[in-house]
Amino acid sequence: MSFSVDVLANIAIELQRGIGHQDRFQRLITTLRQVLECDASALLRYDSRQFIPLAIDGLAKDVLGRRFALEGHPRLEAIARAGDVVRFPADSELPDPYDGLIPGQESLKVHACVGLPLFAGQNLIGALTLDGMQPDQFDVFSDEELRLIAALAAGALSNALLIEQLESQNMLPGDAAPFEAVKQTQMIGLSPGMTQLKKEIEIVAASDLNVLISGETGTGKELVAKAIHEASPRAVNPLIYLNCAALPESVAESELFGHVKGAFTGAISNRSGKFEMADNGTLFLDEIGELSLALQAKLLRVLQYGDIQRVGDDRSLRVDVRVLAATNRDLREEVLAGRFRADLFHRLSVFPLSVPPLRERGDDVILLAGYFCEQCRLRLGLSRVVLSAGARNLLQHYSFPGNVRELEHAIHRAVVLSRATRSGDEVILEAQHFAFPEVTLPPPEAAAVPVVKQNLREATEAFQRETIRQALAQNHHNWAACARMLETDVANLHRLAKRLGLKD
């Protein structure tokens, strides 16, 4: 089998049809998977010695949340080091990063694997991975044909990175130095709420406005502040963190503004406060709603005039600090109740951001679960940590009152429990490993299987045929919706339907 001009043209056309980078990436790997008839494909971005999935096809959703560090994945490291097509033999001793992550094939190891490093000039920018369950699945394709595929993928990724850089620099003031744009990979999530939040971060990061970040406990407000700072012209200078809720009233002023020797008992030397430490950088004030009214007045003065006074000193010090504040309270209600100054609220909330709770983020919970699974795998030296279908279903139907922080702790606890019940370095997280209270799951709809004299293969095919028919009827013969309902990949479903005689 070889690639025709029509095949390559079709891939190029699909790239042009995409609306936005993400859509183009998805069209690329979906088309490649169909052309190559492989079981899974993925487009990865290379950054800081790790591969970050941008688009996947035929893999579990949580793969999009995983971050594949080279030191923990020897196959990906081999791809990164290679300057050309990498074919891994079926008996390769190097573990495949996608073992257990192909839906419906969790218990099987990936047999065929091809890695295509993607370059922009001499710089590695990503990789395309192709995986199959048959050992000789890619033998029919020559290296030259695979290089053509790599060139198309590299061009698409390189153009996307260039456009991202140019768009971010257009947001800067005319005399500002170029800076790195917000990377979509820094904040995990593809839900509408997170997509909008990322756009707002890109917009406000280029300015010097104060930002008020609101959200429930555990939603990741500190991560938002970090993303704003790292994508701003101040990124070369420090980001200083201060938790206002952990400040005793007696030392709060000193922590913020510093003190001079002898200012109070125990002040044995001069000490800089957080504002001085953040000069020319960013100060992140977490739980800003916990500050006393007296400290709020002093903070307001700094925001108005840009100078501070150390405790015990009459002299003023000029500082250039951008303030990012976060709260889990409704500060408007706090203002009405007289617990927060209205003038300070308006100074801080020049550009308000709201971080959505995890229960409103849809499939983001699975992406985040994949991220935490990969963290646990690296931290505990395991070969793989994967979620069972039951565990994924449970996570998607739990409300997570503690948000992302609760999910992180739940994954870590589940990994420990799973390791205690089975030997080896492979962990499969089941629903029973999670101690969530009163989670109501939708009842499974079991298809009635008639009792007839059939051999095992015929009975299995009859069951598959009837299950697909029922799913198609429930989804108005929409194959993509049917595949989602059956928790399988649409390309695999089409192939199975053809084999079962359900479609031509």
Swiss-Prot record:
CDD domains (alphabetical): AAA
Residue stretches making up the Sigma-54 factor interaction domain: 187-416
DNA-binding region coordinates: 479-498
Entry GO MF terms: ATP binding; ATP hydrolysis activity; DNA binding; DNA-binding transcription factor activity
Keywords for this protein: ATP-binding, DNA-binding, Nucleotide-binding, Phosphoprotein, Transcription, Transcription regulation
A UniProt-annotated Pfam family: GAF
HAMAP family per record: NorR
NCBIfam families: PRK05022.1
This protein's name: Anaerobic nitric oxide reductase transcription regulator NorR
Name of the encoding gene: norR
